[in-house]
Amino acid sequence: MMRSHYCGQLNESLDGQEVTLCGWVHRRRDHGGVIFLDIRDREGMAQVVFDPDRAETFAAADRVRSEYVVQITGKVRKRPDGAVNANMASGAIEILGYQLNVLNEAETPPFPLNEYSDVGEETRLRYRFIDLRRPEMADKLRLRSRITSSIRRFLDENGFLDVETPILTRATPEGARDYLVPSRTHAGSFFALPQSPQLFKQLLMVAGFDRYYQIAKCFRDEDLRADRQPEFTQIDIETSFLDESEIMGLTESMIRKLFKEVLDLEFGEFPHMTFEEAMRRYGSDKPDLRNPLELVDVADQLKDVDFKVFAGPANDPKCRVTALRLPGGASMPRSKIDEYTKFVGIYGAKGLAYIKVNERAKGVEGLQSPIVKNIPEANLNNILDRVGAVDGDIVFFGADKFKVVSEALGALRIRLGHDFELLTCEWAPMWVVDFPMFEENEDGSFTALHHPFTAPKCTPEELEANPATALSRAYDMVLNGTELGGGSIRIHRKEMQQAVFRLLGIEAEEQEEKFGFLLDALKFGAPPHGGLAFGLDRLVMLMTGAQSIREVIAFPKTQSAACVMTQAPGLVDAKALRELHIRLREQTKVE
């Protein structure tokens, strides 16, 4: 063994013992003829002292520079009074070094590891192997390892089997674009990288493996956001012979145990909320319950007003008119209101009406807004009473299609909560249930809200008769406004699966071509089954307080789905393309 201890393992109990450390020189200091080296490894840092009494070792220490890889042997001793470093786990001790071996020298890093705040993300990703040396980055990956270990331990203890499913499979419509892999041996045919192990885990249920899990790599060729990557990791779980309440209870126990083990946080029982209630009160199917602001529908008070902006949507069943009260917001300057108006425009809102409540006792005279002249005073009072407005508040309004208003004011609610520091707690887990089975498109066609394999809460005949109002047996776990995991009871009867396919516009021939293997499996005694998948990257992001999942993945892609370190994706030579039966067409230049 080249080392006896990690730096982070050193403490006062080792006083007087000889230790050997291996790591990187984090910092070098020369104080009054004594050289101090801070040595860093994956577990932490330790201070090593070299004095001139050992001339050869002192000279070696004098030559080392930051990021040199070294092996150091010395004796642990307590630091002198007043020299204890409370910010370092080993800050109560230091090592008196008497042997130093330089294992490798290092050029000056492209950015200092002690002063990283102003370094651009692209530079950090280009030199990710340097960036990961920073203690806060190493801490995140260590925590990620602890998280996966805790989850595996829980699932193993509860009788789940870790089963791997294929990476090379065939394309199936799951909502996003597939990454395609050309086949050399089957000219003109392509594999697809899996967006999830969905169908294979269902087939494992048919095969009798009634408790399955996998820490699975998944791939989606879609536009990136702060919480998206083209390849991501999923905690994939499937069970047979459990209903949704049992699956939710089991996975909730897993998350509660995880937070207790890793962060020493105790969660109570997670509240449940229907999709309809979440959209009505919060404008989102993943509400952040730390935020006390709520949307309040006021269409009934505006149906007969002489103001088409409100009256039109108030009389349209596909629209909503909603109010959002911000306590103490009446002092908000017009420039800030304009900023929020521009913000809701991102979500399709055509404007942002408002009423400043200066002094309610004065009636309309105590309200400041360009819209109050269009609304009878009695209706205004009813609206202000309903939202709980008091002097000093501002009330925002949205009036448009249901989806536009929900998304716009739902996003504004989140923005206001952060801007005005309204969050009431650090963690707010919950379940959202009773999702619609389908989303209706403008042309009257339907899209599966979750995926085509989710079971509805009705018979096939009822589903085909009333698809727009059918509810699914789906459930999402939400934490702080982020979807942590989503799942459902699956369809386990062939007739129901075919009915869902038909409603999605997938006719018999296409069903057989794309899903024949699944339909075959459902004929041979498929058990009732369901499951759930958690996004591991999102989970780690939340538990570490990172701002992006790129911060908790060792080697992530950029926002443009590229790796600036390896220069992937890259070109391949003509021979490889010929073997794959592929010919590239030159793009026509636009003049």
From Swiss-Prot:
Gene Ontology MF: a single term: ATP binding
GO biological process: aspartyl-tRNA aminoacylation
Catalytic activity, EC: 6.1.1.23
Parts of the chain that traverse the membrane: none
Location relative to the cell: Cytoplasm
Gene Ontology CC entries for this record: cytoplasm
Keyword Nucleus set for record: no
EC class (word): ligase
Substrates-to-products reaction catalysed: tRNA(Asx) + L-aspartate + ATP = L-aspartyl-tRNA(Asx) + AMP + diphosphate
Parts forming coiled coils: none
PANTHER family reported in the protein's UniProt record: ASPARTATE--TRNA LIGASE, MITOCHONDRIAL (PTHR22594:SF5), ASPARTYL/LYSYL-TRNA SYNTHETASE (PTHR22594)
UniProt name for this protein: Aspartate--tRNA(Asp/Asn) ligase
